[in-house]
């Protein structure tokens, strides 16, 4: 059986080339507090209209850039897209985003879980019998 030799491309050299990688990589910073998750990304030089924040299937947060008709035709398009899986315990209605001084900040609030104490005298007699039987 003959095996063909596969030539491996030196990707680290090609991708590190300045001509192919004109823009610095945008890193998304994530932090968590007791009340929310916060995503921050530096997107300098963009207008608010060029940034899209979307929720897909109530599971994923997508942050991306999109060229608009007002974008100067002589400028190369800068594209950015990141997709994050959201935890189940978030408040979908309370998600907010803001873009100021070239920094996009998306705040995803956590759903407030409250525990309710049940007074045994409030439990109907039929449920008390079921609890004892179990």
Curated annotation (Swiss-Prot):
InterPro entries: A-crystallin/Hsp20_dom, HSP20-like_chaperone, Small_HSP. The keyword Hydrolase does not apply. One of its GO terms (cellular component) is cytoplasm. It is found in: Cytoplasm. It holds the Pfam family HSP20. Keywords: Cytoplasm, Stress response. PROSITE patterns: SHSP (PS01031). The keyword Cytoplasm applies. It comes from the Eukaryota. Residues 19-126 form the sHSP domain. May form oligomeric structures. Belongs to the small heat shock protein (HSP20) family. This is 15.4 kDa class V heat shock protein. It comes from Arabidopsis thaliana.
